[in-house]
């Protein structure tokens, strides 16, 4: 019975996340650095430059609604289909289930897809697939299979009936086995994408809808920034409130 208990513990109490040396939890933080008087740009420009660098990796492609011809609805991918071609930046129909399914399959075969769900509200259309076929794949196979797809979306605007939701509690509790990254600005988002792409776990990045045209200083080391996952960022420390 002791041997069976040890075996079952290994079978059913391990591998929710990657346990390899490539786990994104091992990523070291590389902070943004700036010139004394940095150039201020729209947040979307920071992501555009970052995605252009990611796409130079032959394994990386971006798939989703309006990501190609119009450069996505917030212009973070503007011009990238022209540079890299429609196989690297691919427009799809309005079929979230198909988008996610293609991404999961590609990631299981060694590619590194970044699939876009245009708004966070729409993540519930493919939710059964995300929950049953993606988030728990590593756990169900005791680490034998991986699907390190990155699901990119945006939300939190909280300013209207549509395209404004922030159902994070449902997602965090419903998609065990996935890293959830919620950046406060697009520089931090770029670092989170880089950390996830360097690792071998699945991840969701929820960008802030109101951040694409807010001005941010352009880092001098934008293409090197990494965010350490699971470690809170301290913006201002105090005696009563931090």
Regions found by a protein language model. Name each.
Residues 211-233:
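Aromatic-enriched
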């Amino acid at each position: 019975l002791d041997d069976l208990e040890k075996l079952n513990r290994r079978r059913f109490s391990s591998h929710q996340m990657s346990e390899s040396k490539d786990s994104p939890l091992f990523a070291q933080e590389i902070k943004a650095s700036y010139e004394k008087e940095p150039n201020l740009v729209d947040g979307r420009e920071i992501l555009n430059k970052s995605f252009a660098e990611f796409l130079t990796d032959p394994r990386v492609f971006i798939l989703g609604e309006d990501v190609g011809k119009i450069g996505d609805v917030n212009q973070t991918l503007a011009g990238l289909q022209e540079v890299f071609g429609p196989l690297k930046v691919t427009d799809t129909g309005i079929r979230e289930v198909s988008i996610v399914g293609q991404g999961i399959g590609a990631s299981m075969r060694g590619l590194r897809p970044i699939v876009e769900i245009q708004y966070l509200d729409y993540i519930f259309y493919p939710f059964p697939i995300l929950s049953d076929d993606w988030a728990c794949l590593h756990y169900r196979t005791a680490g034998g299979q991986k699907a390190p797809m990155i699901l990119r979306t945006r939300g939190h605007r909280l300013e209207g009936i549509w395209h404004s939701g922030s159902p994070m509690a449902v997602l965090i509790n419903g998609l065990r086995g996935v890293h959830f990254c919620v950046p406060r600005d697009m520089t931090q988002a770029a670092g989170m994408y880089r950390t996830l792409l360097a690792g071998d776990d699945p991840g969701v990045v929820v960008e802030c809808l109101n951040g694409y045209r807010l001005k941010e200083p352009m880092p001098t080391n934008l293409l090197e920034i990494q965010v350490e996952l699971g470690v809170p960022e301290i913006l201002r420390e105090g005696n009563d409130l931090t």
